[in-house]
Amino acid sequence: MLFEVFGEVLASYIVSSKTKGELAFPVNNAPPDSLVAINCVVLFLRSAIGSCSGAKELIRSSALELSCSSSCGLPATDKPGSFHSGALSKSILSANEAVVSKSSLSFLSSFVDI
C-alpha cells in the first residue's frame, strides 16, 4: 500500500481513519509549517489510497498548491480515488493556514517512487 512507502518517517503524522480531518498534533502548539503541510498532504492522499497512480499524479503535479486550514479543510469523499477539484483550486484562509508548496511536495515525493 501507499503508506508502506512512507514508512516510519511520516508515521507520527498520519491520522487514523477515526480522526480523519484532524491534525495529528495540537493546533495551539503547531510545529513548523512544513510539518503541518506534510500532515495535510498525507490526509489528502488518504482519499487516493484506492489508486496509487492517482496519488503519484497528485504529488507529480508541478502546479499543485494545497491550502490547509487548522483542520486541513479536506473534503470528504465517498470512495477511494475520488477527488474534489475544488480542494485543489480554493484557498482556505485561517490563522493556522499552512500552504503545501512545490518544495514540500518535492520533499514528499522523495518517499514515493514516481
From Swiss-Prot:
Membrane topology annotation: Peripheral membrane protein
Entry keyword set: Membrane, Vacuole
GO terms classed as biological process: vacuole fusion, non-autophagic
Gene Ontology CC: one annotated term: fungal-type vacuole membrane
Domain of life: Eukaryota
Principal location class: membrane
Location within or outside the cell: Vacuole membrane
Function: Required for vacuolar fusion. Involved in the early steps of the fusion pathway.
Protein name according to UniProt: Vacuolar morphogenesis protein 10
